[in-house]
Amino acid sequence: MELYSGLDLHSRNTYIGILDPNFNRVFKKRVSNNLDLILKTLEPFKDQLKGLVVESTYNWYWLVNGLMDADYGCVHLANPS
């Protein structure tokens, strides 16, 4: 099953939501802004994730770079305005 994730990035934590193609919530969790923790949280869904969207706030660089370095090639930025 294809899955899609949105990552709502804040200064201290990230809210991760994962949806199926019918917009049913498959997973939700708030985690600390720690790349290893975020990658560990996403790992069970990695093969099914067809898109990840990160809010392009002032601090998005480390997260997007980390996701891309971990072979999440489907990372997109969303304009929060």
Annotate each language-model stretch with its function.
Residues M1-S81:
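Phosphate- and other anionic-substrate recognition elements at nucleic-acid/protein interfaces
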